[in-house]
């Protein structure tokens, strides 16, 4: 249940009561396992609206969604689509080889960690940022190029918040808990 910690909520209430009211007492369930977060993001990208079914099917087939089980399944994963299968296999190999790992990512600045994650097939900036926030618990990862963030800002604060200047002002005001 992170990164929405008590200090983050307290900061949000003090600097942005309008957003605090919109968020309310929301609690967000975030994936804590790196590979599971990668796999969910990859399957979600490949299955889109059918994600819940596709994820349940993958979990049922593998028993446990882990890099080892993905590699064991190998070509059978093509039932989920060739692109998704290649992406899952690549992510599994990267995690098992240490190319992508919690310790390595935790040691990198946000932009570099995003770059490492985006080097994997089917991992885009938005998924990489979700992993930084959810798995690595980075409390202040906000990007102007994230349309979902800008859309939410516009709903709460109006169109001016979506300009580069408005976004940067928002980000500065909410630091160090911008992700919350």
What do the PLM-derived regions correspond to, one by one?
Residues 87, 148, 180:
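Charged catalytic carboxylate motif
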Residues 31-45:
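Alpha-helical scaffold segments that form or flank carboxylate-/histidine-based iron centers
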Residues 1-34:
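Intrinsically disordered, low-complexity, charged terminal extensions of DNA damage-control enzymes
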């Amino acid at each position: 249940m992170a990164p929405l910690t008590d200090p983050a909520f307290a900061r949000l209430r003090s600097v942005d009561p309008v957003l605090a009211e919109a968020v309310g007492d929301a609690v967000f369930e975030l994936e804590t396992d790196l590979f599971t977060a990668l796999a969910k993001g990859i399957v979600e990208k490949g299955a889109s609206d059918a994600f819940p079914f596709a994820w349940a099917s993958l979990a049922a087939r593998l028993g446990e969604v882990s890099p080892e089980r993905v590699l064991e399944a190998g070509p059978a994963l093509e039932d989920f689509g060739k692109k998704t299968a290649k992406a899952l296999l690549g992510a599994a190999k990267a995690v098992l080889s240490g190319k992508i790992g919690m310790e390595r990512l935790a040691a990198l600045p946000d932009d570099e960690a995003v770059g490492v994650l985006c080097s994997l097939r089917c991992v885009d900036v938005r998924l990489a940022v979700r992993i930084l926030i959810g798995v690595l618990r980075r409390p202040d990862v906000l990007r102007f190029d994230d349309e979902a963030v800008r859309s939410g800002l516009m709903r709460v604060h109006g169109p001016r918040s979506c300009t580069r200047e408005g976004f940067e002002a928002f980000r500065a005001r909410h630091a160090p808990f911008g992700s919350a």
